[in-house]
Amino acid sequence: MDYYYPMEEEEEVHERPRFRRPVHPWQWHHWQNLLGLLSSSSPSPATAAAAQRCSHVSWEETAAAHLYSASLPGVRKEEIRVEVEDAMYLVIRTELDDGGDGDGGGGGGRRSFARKFRLPAMVDADGISAEYTHGVLRVTVPRLHTRARPVVNLAGGGGGGGGPACDPVARAA
């Protein structure tokens, strides 16, 4: 007598799931490839691949500062611009020559890279620093530390309190 083992049969069937998680059209990673292609002046696949290589930017938050790190291989320090727009946005831009020989051949062109970040409200825009070493740009945006509000101590007067005026236990009794 043959036995029916439904679990073994079902394991052999590999179907794609019917329902997939919906894709939100405004998520950044869906548009990142398109923006990389639009920012390059030459639509060749080599330029698009190079623009994609240059687009890794990360952000980290610490207690003292916001740290931005951009991987920009093959970019000279003179080709990088870090700007603050309207005291609200940090902009990292590069414009690269692809090494064209100037005779109109198809090998030359310009490539650009730009990322814009909205800065938090409490940052010191004048204290922003940037450093470029080994193909990695690091931008440090320090937090704006305001001094603590002064605390006023109230002195207990001798006029009928029976204890210190600021003591919550004395007031409750």
Curated annotation (Swiss-Prot):
GO biological process: protein complex oligomerization; protein folding; response to heat; response to hydrogen peroxide; response to salt stress
Coiled-coil intervals: none
Pfam families given in the database record: HSP20
Cellular component GO terms, alphabetical: cytoplasm
Subunit and partners: May form oligomeric structures.
Residue intervals of the sHSP domain: 48-157
Cell compartments where the protein resides: Cytoplasm
Protein name as annotated: 18.8 kDa class V heat shock protein
InterPro entries recorded: A-crystallin/Hsp20_dom, HSP20-like_chaperone, Small_HSP
Induction, as annotated: Not induced by heat shock.
Family per record: Belongs to the small heat shock protein (HSP20) family.
GO molecular function, one term: unfolded protein binding
Main location: cytoplasm
Organism for this UniProt entry: Oryza sativa subsp. japonica (Rice)
Keyword Magnesium: no
Gene: HSP18.8
Keyword terms: Cytoplasm, Stress response
